[in-house]
Amino acid sequence: MQRIHKIKTKQQVKETISDEAIEQLRDHCACARDLAMIDLLYSTGIRVGELVNLNIDDVNFEARECVVFGKGDKERRVYFDAKAKLHLQNYLKHRTDRNPALFVTLDAPHDRLKISGVEVRLRELGRSVNLVKIHPHKFRRTMATRAIDKGMPIEQVQKILGHSQIDTTMQYAMVNQTNVKASHQKFIA
C-alpha cells in the first residue's frame, strides 16, 4: 500500500490586530461588558468557546488568572493583565443579575452569552471603527504573536494557548519581520 503525501499549499500569514486598533475598539465600547470581553480576549488568548463557558468563580482577581476548560475538557490556567482586571471588576460591579456566567447578555433575563453573540458584537464594534475582519480568534492569534515577538519561549506560549502540539502554536506565531531583522543584526551581522 502506498502512502499518500500531503499536498503543500501556500501558507498565508494571517493578520493580527494592531495596538492602535485595540485602542480604537476600547474607545468605542459602549458598555463595560464589551470592554472587559475585549481585554480578556486580548490578554489571555483564550478561545471564544472558553470565554463563554467561564463562570465568575473561575476568575481569581488576586492572582489575575482564570481556569478555563479547553478542547477535550482539558483544564488550564490563563493569566490576564491589570487593564483586564480593572475592566472585569468594573463590569461585575455594575451587573444586577445572579447568573454565575462571567459574560451574560445585556438584556433580561441575562442569559449566558453564546459564541455567536460574541462574534456578532466584535464584528459590530470593528465595523464601528472601520476595522474589517474583527473576530474572537484574531485576538488569540494577536496575543500569541505578541508574546513570541516580546521573547516569550514558544513552549510557554503553547501552554498558555492549550495546544498539545507545538506545531499548532507555530502556526499562530506570525513572526514579525522587523524582529527577524533585529535578531539577524544581533546574532549574525
Regions found by a protein language model. Name each.
Residues 1-189:
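Conserved catalytic core of the tyrosine transesterase superfamily
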